[in-house]
């Protein structure tokens, strides 16, 4: 029984190290750059957050919203064949030639206070 438990622990440890190594490689390459780092907007204002990418093979560009103590949730996403997509007060704009996409929140509300981040894959 001890040998089986020891083997299970070793497999789990190796998987965690592999995942950790993968994350380091991705962070070293910095797949996307988001700006600004923080943003203060008055109620009713427009929030604009930009994201730039380098890899032209990417074909999916999501924005996520994360409230304190919660996991990230997909807010809106776009593909390169569409220049703009709207969902309620949220708009995502895509500029393929500039290799960037932007998130716009119209009529910002106090309930919109959260962490927003972009991704590309």
UniProtKB/Swiss-Prot annotation:
This protein's GO CC annotations: T cell receptor complex
InterPro entries, alphabetized: Ig-like_dom, Ig-like_dom_sf, Ig-like_fold, Ig_V-set, TCR_variable_domain
Annotated GO biological process: adaptive immune response
Origin superkingdom: Eukaryota
Major site of localization recorded for this protein: membrane
Gene Ontology molecular function: peptide antigen binding
Protein name: T cell receptor alpha variable 23/delta variable 6
The organism's taxonomic lineage, starting at the top: Eukaryota, Metazoa, Chordata, Craniata, Vertebrata
Gene: TRAV23DV6
């Amino acid at each position: 029984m001890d040998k089986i438990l020891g083997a299970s622990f070793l497999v789990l440890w190796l998987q965690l190290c592999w995942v950790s190594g993968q994350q380091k490689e991705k962070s070293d390459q910095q797949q996307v750059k988001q700006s600004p780092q923080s943003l203060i907007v008055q109620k009713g204002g427009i929030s604009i957050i930009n994201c730039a990418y380098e890899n032209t093979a990417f074909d999916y560009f999501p924005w996520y919203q994360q409230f304190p103590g919660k996991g990230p949730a997909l807010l809106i996403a776009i593909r390169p064949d569409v220049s703009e997509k709207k969902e309620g007060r949220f708009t995502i704009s895509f500029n393929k030639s500039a290799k960037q996409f932007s998130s716009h929140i119209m009529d910002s509300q106090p309930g919109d206070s959260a962490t927003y981040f972009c991704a590309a894959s």
